[in-house]
């Protein structure tokens, strides 16, 4: 089902054309497998190598529609990656959201390190190059995210001014 997503197929092939990138696939398991994985303490792993997702540099999540938001939490939890971006450690994967629902990322912003807004194939080469340069220079994940934040196509919640939300509860119905 997951590979029927044309955007995912394009990115998968594009990333794997680079000699310095190995892109693998991982999918949110159905309830029966989720239960077994939790009972047996099996972390979520990649389809190709069976390596735990937590060992990757990046975890890219395609957000096709709002109903899949809970799957994001399931994937992070099964991967043993902190749900909240602010709680992630230096060796955790950088969690990037993309796809149609990335155009309005605020409802789920606290779970992602960054979002790519727009057509992914236009910027990822620059993003991978920046990550590689940051790593070679001994930079941290925070350094990389900060460097990525000025690009208007990248939304990095931790480096974006948070707006105060005002709540005005309904006083009554007539």
How should these model regions be labeled?
Residues 3-11:
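Conserved alpha-helical elements of sugar-nucleotide-dependent glycosyltransferases
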């Amino acid at each position: 089902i997951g590979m029927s997503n044309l955007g995912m197929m394009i990115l998968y092939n594009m990333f794997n054309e680079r000699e310095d990138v190995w892109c693998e696939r991982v999918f949110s398991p159905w309830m029966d497998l989720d239960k077994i994985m939790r009972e047996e303490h099996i972390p979520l792993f990649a389809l190709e190598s069976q390596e735990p997702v937590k060992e990757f540099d990046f975890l890219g999540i395609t957000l096709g529609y709002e109903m899949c938001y809970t799957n994001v939490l399931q994937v992070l939890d099964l991967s043993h990656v902190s749900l909240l971006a602010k709680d992630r450690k230096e060796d955790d994967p950088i969690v990037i959201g993309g796809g149609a629902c990335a155009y309005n990322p605020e409802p789920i912003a606290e779970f992602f390190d960054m979002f790519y807004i727009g057509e992914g194939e236009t910027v990822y080469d620059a993003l991978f190059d920046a990550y590689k340069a940051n790593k070679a220079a001994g930079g941290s994940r925070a350094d990389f995210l900060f460097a990525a934040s000025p690009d208007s196509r990248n939304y990095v919640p931790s480096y974006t001014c948070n707006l105060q939300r005002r709540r005005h509860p309904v006083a009554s119905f007539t």
